[in-house]
Amino acid sequence: MTEFDNLTWLHGKPQGSGLLKANPEDFVVVEDLGFTPDGEGEHILLRILKNGCNTRFVADALAKFLKIHAREVSFAGQKDKHAVTEQWLCARVPGKEMPDFSAFQLEGCKVLEYARHKRKLRLGALKGNAFTLVLREISDRRDVETRLQAIRDGGVPNYFGAQRFGIGGSNLQGALRWAQSNAPVRDRNKRSFWLSAARSALFNQIVHQRLKKPDFNQVVDGDALQLAGRGSWFVATSEELPELQRRVDEKELMITASLPGSGEWGTQRAALAFEQDAIAQETVLQSLLLREKVEASRRAMLLYPQQLSWNWWDDVTVELRFWLPAGSFATSVVRELINTMGDYAHIAE
């Protein structure tokens, strides 16, 4: 298995280094749910600004304030403790009376707005995230500038970031230990983290191998293609390749890579053979996903940051702004720009 730091770069390995997250204000994330609260229902959606608090900590504090069980507070995604983040939490509080959230006091946390909603907010149920990042101590401004232009046009690999695998790869190591054992994992969080790390590592490996090919973005017979911004896909046939290639070049369609598991992978013929060969040696992780009945799925191979802009504060400091769809990683954009000083596996998704 190729280490995250050695996965293929789309624009070549960066020439310079830089620092990500010198302080929390250098990493700002604003959740975009893609919908507005219903204004009625037994749940309450709260938009919360936090600094120095991780998501689970805030959710537990909110549950305690509302005198409800922790499982009655949900969120769409984990956000990092060492960042400034705006995200939505959801609490199940039946009844007409609205709690007085001005009395909710937690250091580093502020309730910005709240409203009733009919449905529970589930993990992954958001449109995307808007990022404002500051990269400091950049050693090669010219190289970063060139890469930003290239990313605007060509995107970046849609890798799962190092944080998916835990500090020091602990989640992936946990998955490997579990795969080689018949002992059940009763901790639901560990089970989820380990299975996610296993599938993500296999996806990264498939993308890594495809990006090694000079014609990586050429549609091949049996590729699974996805309409940009959609989750469903269809299979390319040899008769359609010229027209499908035109649509891929125009970013209307995206070539996908497998999120392996049980069931059909989605690709066929030449594309399926390539994906199977790319992870042929990773039998332990594949067996785990089959054993635990994790359903196979697809994910776009490339990621195009939307609304990408940047502003140089000086020759060694640049502020980046961009929007990414849910499930994509800002750190996978940053790794195409600089060799990051320090380990950012601690950054939450």
Swiss-Prot record:
> Membrane-spanning regions, if any?
none
Query: Top enzyme class of this protein?
Result: isomerase
Cystine pairs annotated here are none
GO MF terms held by the record: pseudouridine synthase activity; RNA binding; tRNA pseudouridine(13) synthase activity
State if Lipid metabolism is listed as a keyword.
Answer: no
Q: Read off the SUPFAM superfamilies from this record.
A: Pseudouridine synthase
What reaction gets catalysed by this protein?
Answer: uridine(13) in tRNA = pseudouridine(13) in tRNA
- Which InterPro entries does the record associate with it? PsdUridine_synth_cat_dom_sf, PsdUridine_synth_TruD, PsdUridine_synth_TruD_CS, PsdUridine_synth_TruD_insert, TruD_catalytic, TruD_insert_sf, TruD_pseudoU_synthase
Q: Name one GO cellular component term.
A: cytosol
Q: Where is the active site?
A: 80
Q: What biological-process terms (Gene Ontology) are attached?
A: pseudouridine synthesis; tRNA pseudouridine synthesis
Q: Would you say which domain of life the source belongs to? A: Bacteria
The record's function comment reads: Responsible for synthesis of pseudouridine from uracil-13 in transfer RNAs.
Q: Which family does it belong to?
A: Belongs to the pseudouridine synthase TruD family.
Task: Return the protein name.
Answer: tRNA pseudouridine synthase D
